[in-house]
Amino acid sequence: MNKIILSIETTTNICSVSLFQNKKLIYLFEDNNRKHSSLLGLFVEKIFINSEIPIQSIDAIAISIGPGSYTGLRIGLSFAKGLAFSINKPIIPINTLESLNEGIKDLNYFLVLHAFKDNFFIQEYKNGKEYGDIFFNTIESIINKKVYGYKNNLLINCINNINPSSKKIARIAYKNYDNYIENDIKLIKPNYIKPIEFNKK
């Protein structure tokens, strides 16, 4: 696919920005110090200066839309929407858990993302595919299962760590370009999954 994609991941403490051309990584900047508001614009600027690719040449902006940190989601999506509007480009919204799942070879497992305190967003996979809906629980509920997720310095031995990255966002964007792309950026909303939503079911 002959496309240039700017990819952004800000749903955890990691701020990750990358530029891909024809599915190949051109540049990547990442920082894990939760400085999204000060680094996101800087990373994007550096990418286009270093790559010598005009920002108007990109075909789309891929962005992780949650679940994840409320602050990180707001910063990332607001930036992506503003940039997309200014250069008249579409956005490719990507579910955070879907991006974390990118590259896992196991077939039956649980994928987790820390929400707050002892609680996690949890998605079960069977035969390599999503099984059921995302649910909200403590890690103890799946302690004896195969578990993947972003540990973010949490001392939880049962989790096989996977770092969020804009590289994974871009790979999914290429795979699902025609199905995921959204030209009307007003329709794109952050995926704020809250505990109360699970309790209503």
Region spans (language model):
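Short, conserved micro-motifs enriched in small and acidic residues
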Residues: R34-K35, Y70-R74, P164
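N-terminal phosphate-binding loop and adjacent alpha-helix
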Residues: N32-I49
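DPxDG-like acidic metal-binding loop motif
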Residues: A60-T96
